[in-house]
Amino acid sequence: MKKKIGLICEGGGTKAAYTCGVLQCFLDENINFPYTVGISAGAEVLVAFVSKQRERLKVAGVDAASNPKAIGLYPLLKERGVFGIQYVCKFIEELAPLDYQTFMENETELDIGLYNMDNDEVEYYGKEYLDPQEQILVQASCALFLLTRPYKWNGHTYMDAGLVDMIPIEQSIRKGMDKHIFISTKEENYVRKPAPSWQLRLSSLFYPGKKNVFAMRIIIANGEL
């Protein structure tokens, strides 16, 4: 019996360049998967993988990540956040427009993880939810904690699912995959250090009145953020 193998990509910001290199090799060798799932930058690059666009992987993982307008004062003025996810998505589209037809016709399934701030749950949406023009689904998945503003979409407030589910292997299991290939953006033997207390204070300041603040307290206290 043929095993069903899921491909899992975590976030990692600019370190997703390494993920892009692996995905390019998969494309070069015609290695396909029935199911893929990603969060944050992992979701962004999986869009390029499912659309079979080698150049888009390079643009997303290297060119966009190294663009000086992606981080700092420019996005702070334009998007009210230190990381300019809207600018990055537009930059990628200008240099390597999404081949939406190939993306949708590819039999590979793609789930993108978002953190719903209203109910403290991670929700996964298939590629059919991706608007090829706005791409709010990807932008919301890449909305980094404390660095970008949350996104309103589908009647709820969303941000980077890495707050809760850094490695979405459980979603791959739920989708019936027998085995899983995980592309990590962390070095071998990586152990996350406890987060500093200032993140707890900033979370209360940045996200006042949200039901998820208590959940964030637990996440930060456990050093999982």
Where would I find each of the regions flagged by the language model?
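Patatin-like phospholipase
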Residues: 1-39, 47-225
